[in-house]
């Protein structure tokens, strides 16, 4: 398979899985909508979301990144971490705690002195991935162990000053 096509295909799969998980997890808890609207889809959506999370967990590298060029940016691990969070998973417990923590550690490990979160293939430019990373870290702030919390508290102000 041609390398460019393969990279595009892997990126496309990741983006679809991440956004599918985020979309269905967020919509399942919508306020003011009768439960009957979602109940008929729940048996189809929940297993699909779980399969997506399992895929992301299996695909994650030991260092917290993901395969191919775009998976090494800070944006993809941040989006994947938010996908786990959107289904109610926590960095301190549960089947995906290790995956979430690897996402956190990867992002924190790739912050420059300027505050910029950048690693690997920047794709649309370094600010694209950078802007996703503080959103993820803001979401996990307060849910992590004290050491990670300290690192997040130090990293976020520097990151936000760039935006």
Predicted features and spans:
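N-terminal secretory signal peptides that target proteins for export/translocation
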Residues: 1-12
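Preference for long, amphipathic alpha-helical scaffolds in soluble/luminal domains
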Residues: 2-4, 26-163
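Bacterial N-terminal signal peptides
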Residues: 14-26
């Amino acid at each position: 398979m041609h390398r460019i096509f393969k990279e595009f295909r892997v990126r496309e799969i990741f983006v679809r899985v991440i956004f599918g998980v985020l979309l269905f997890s967020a919509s399942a808890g919508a306020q003011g909508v009768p439960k009957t609207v979602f109940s008929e889809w729940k048996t189809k959506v929940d297993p699909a979301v779980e399969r997506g999370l399992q895929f992301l967990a299996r695909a994650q590298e030991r260092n917290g990144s993901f395969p191919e060029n775009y998976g090494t940016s800070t944006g993809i691990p941040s989006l994947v971490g938010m996908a786990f969070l959107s289904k109610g998973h926590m960095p301190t417990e549960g089947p995906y705690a290790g995956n979430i923590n690897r996402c956190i550690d990867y992002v924190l490990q790739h912050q420059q002195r300027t505050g910029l979160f950048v690693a690997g293939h920047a794709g649309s430019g370094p600010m694209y991935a950078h802007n996703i990373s503080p959103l993820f870290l803001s979401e996990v702030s307060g849910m992590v162990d004290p050491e990670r919390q300290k690192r997040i508290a130090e990293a976020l102000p520097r990151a936000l000053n760039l935006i």
